[in-house]
């Protein structure tokens, strides 16, 4: 798998410095024995990996020690429930502290309200993803810079 992926990326001339592959928490567990060697091989070659949907309740914290990831993406349900569930901010802070101990960046998903940005930053979140910043769009549209989705969400 690792050799196939390297050839695919090389064939398209993509810059690895601008690419970070996501491993979903669920898929990492389902195919761990297959995924781990491939991820380790690619990470040794400088590839970036993010553990996606972390905190969804599927993986143990041990996967942060086993998988050579550089980024942890906090499951969006924790962000969605940030203001209504008092435990969500506590879990986010704990995940941020754990990631910091490993030297990992933390991304919060599903950020749909810009008012959450200061609170998430105070808990240790490095980056956010969601409609608060930008609506999804096709790569070709983003590259052209003239997509109707280019405007931040209201």
Regions found by a protein language model. Give the residues of each.
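EAL-family c-di-GMP phosphodiesterase catalytic domain
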Residues: 18-32, 45-154
């Amino acid at each position: 798998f690792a050799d196939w992926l390297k050839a695919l990326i090389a064939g398209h001339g993509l810059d690895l410095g601008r690419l970070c592959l996501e491993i979903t928490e669920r898929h990492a567990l389902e195919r761990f024995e297959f995924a781990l060697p491939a991820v380790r091989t690619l990470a040794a070659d400088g590839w970036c990996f993010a553990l996606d949907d972390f905190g969804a309740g599927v993986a143990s914290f041990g996967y942060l020690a086993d998988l050579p990831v550089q980024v942890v993406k906090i499951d969006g349900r924790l962000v969605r429930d940030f203001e209504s569930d008092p435990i969500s901010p506590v879990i986010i802070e704990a995940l941020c502290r754990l990631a910091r101990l490993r030297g990992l960046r933390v991304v919060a998903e599903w950020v749909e309200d810009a008012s959450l940005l200061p609170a998430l930053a105070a808990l240790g979140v490095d980056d956010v993803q969601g409609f608060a910043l930008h609506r999804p769009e096709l790569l070709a549209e983003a590259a052209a810079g003239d997509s109707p989705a280019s405007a931040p969400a209201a």
